[in-house]
């Protein structure tokens, strides 16, 4: 499918069934925010279960560059010595956020109000992703941000300045846009308000409240009071529902499967994928429901199910935006047709995820009609042909989704350019193989 150098190539093949218990990778969104708010708080923040993927490590490096002491105590355990809202120092180098759109957009908001100059950049993929959606509202607050294409593309040069509070009606439901404005509002006197067309994930609000900020939430509206007194916290990061979605779908589509996924974050702004899979007839049960650090958590038991095609309600899209690539796999192996609509945001992720999944699954024998805002997928419960080499477009979620599809292919599948799996799920192959996957790294052979 691609003449581009294949990079890390992984083979995936059919398996009899999946069984066992795993804890998926730690939540990436919460890990990023733990570092950010730990740095801005007074005193020490102790984090357990931090995701040590490349995206979060970039955030840690950025704050170390700005003078914050962040000590790695053990695997996933960090101590952050917060210096308060005005304690960051001007970085002596460009802040390279790698592949992380979350880190770049959130830091854009934070750095806009700092009394120094900074530059944010990233890899080729990140430099092609839209940044105007955060630059525009920040500019309304008085931010001075310059970038390519009129400030719409990174690298971004930020000349920190005193900001003014605003009320911003966001045209899209995006936690990254909302969080960038909230972070700018932290260092801004008065109340900053964001109104969204639908509720986006709320990890920023939950964590800020835990750190001591005054945050008011009313439906789709969030207001932050500037200059809060943030205090260091003890944080335990749950498993990421976005990471759990891969073994979840794998078990649902593989006959005889019965697995348990431990300690998965059940934040209601993130459980859209559960709603979609349950609507298809998925056998997913929540066990041991509890709350950890202000976030709902549960263990999930997932069993093979004869899935049925559904029509997506566009209002669920913001709550499942990162899980749609693997949802496409579930739809391709369901009975009947599935219509994905209202998901045009997928086109401006690490790749154009609609085209990437449509091309990849069609190469494996699936029937997919691409639409501007989604796709019409005609499922085949008997499985796919496979026997192809497909491109992940260096997108971690595309790579993992196509590897899941390989479980139900008659011939094994080669997925190219899988290197970026390390951004969100470094232990993916090891954990999936422990459940019964047949993943093999064939990069050198």
UniProtKB/Swiss-Prot annotation:
Phosphoenolpyruvate binds at residues 28, 101, 129, 176, 353, 397. It catalyses: 3-phosphoshikimate + phosphoenolpyruvate = 5-O-(1-carboxyvinyl)-3-phosphoshikimate + phosphate. Pathway: Metabolic intermediate biosynthesis; chorismate biosynthesis; chorismate from D-erythrose 4-phosphate and phosphoenolpyruvate: step 6/7. 3-phosphoshikimate binds at residues 28-29, 33, 174, 176, 322, 349. Its EC number is 2.5.1.19. Residues 1-20 have a biased composition (Polar residues). Belongs to the EPSP synthase family. Catalyzes the transfer of the enolpyruvyl moiety of phosphoenolpyruvate (PEP) to the 5-hydroxyl of shikimate-3-phosphate (S3P) to produce enolpyruvyl shikimate-3-phosphate and inorganic phosphate. This is 3-phosphoshikimate 1-carboxyvinyltransferase. It comes from Magnetococcus marinus (strain ATCC BAA-1437 / JCM 17883 / MC-1).
């Amino acid at each position: 499918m691609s003449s581009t150098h294949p990079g890390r190539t992984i083979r995936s093949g059919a398996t009899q069934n999946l069984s066992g218990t795993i804890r998926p990778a730690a939540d990436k969104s919460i890990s990023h925010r733990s570092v950010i708010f730990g740095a801005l708080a007074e005193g020490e923040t102790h984090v357990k279960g931090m995701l040590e993927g490349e995206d979060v490590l970039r955030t840690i490096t950025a704050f170390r560059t700005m003078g914050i002491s962040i000590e790695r105590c053990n695997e996933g355990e960090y101590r952050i010595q917060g210096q308060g809202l005005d304690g960051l120092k001007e970085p002596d180098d460009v802040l390279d956020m790698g592949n992380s759109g979350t880190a770049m957009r959130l830091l854009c908001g934070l750095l806009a109000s700092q009394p120094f100059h900074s530059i944010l950049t990233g890899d080729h993929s990140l430099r092609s992703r839209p940044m105007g959606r955060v630059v525009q509202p920040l500019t309304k607050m008085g931010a001075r941000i310059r970038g390519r294409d009129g400030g719409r593309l990174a690298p971004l040069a930020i000349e920190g300045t005193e900001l003014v509070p605003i009320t911003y009606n966001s045209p899209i439901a995006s936690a990254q846009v909302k969080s960038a404005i909230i972070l700018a509002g932290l260092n801004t006197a008065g109340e900053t308000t964001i109104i969204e067309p639908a509720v986006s994930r709320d990890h920023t609000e939950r964590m800020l409240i835990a750190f001591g900020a005054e945050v008011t939430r009313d439906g789709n509206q969030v207001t932050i009071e500037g200059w809060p007194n943030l205090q260091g916290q003890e944080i335990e990061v749950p498993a990421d529902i976005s990471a759990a979605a891969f073994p979840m779908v794998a078990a649902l589509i593989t006959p005889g499967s019965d697995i348990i996924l431990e300690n998965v974050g059940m934040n209601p702004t993130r459980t859209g994928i559960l709603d979609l899979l349950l609507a298809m007839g998925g056998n997913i049960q929540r066990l041991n429901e509890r709350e950890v650090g202000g976030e709902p958590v549960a263990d999930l038991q997932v069993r093979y199910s004869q899935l049925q095609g559904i029509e997506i309600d566009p209002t669920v899209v913001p709550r499942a935006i990162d899980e749609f690539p693997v949802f496409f796999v579930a739809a391709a192996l369901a009975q009947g047709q599935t219509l994905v609509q209202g998901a045009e945001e997928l086109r401006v992720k690490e790749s154009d995820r609609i085209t990437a999944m449509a091309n990849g699954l069609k190469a494996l024998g699936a029937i997919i009609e691409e639409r501007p805002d989604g796709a019409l997928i005609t499922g085949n419960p008997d499985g796919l042909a496979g026997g192809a080499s497909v491109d992940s477009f260096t997108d971690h979620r595309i790579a993992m989704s196509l590897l899941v599809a390989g479980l139900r292919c008659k011939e094994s599948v080669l997925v190219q350019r899988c290197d970026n799996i390390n951004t969100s799920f470094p232990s993916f192959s090891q954990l999936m193989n422990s459940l019964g996957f047949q993943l093999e790294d064939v990069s050198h052979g």
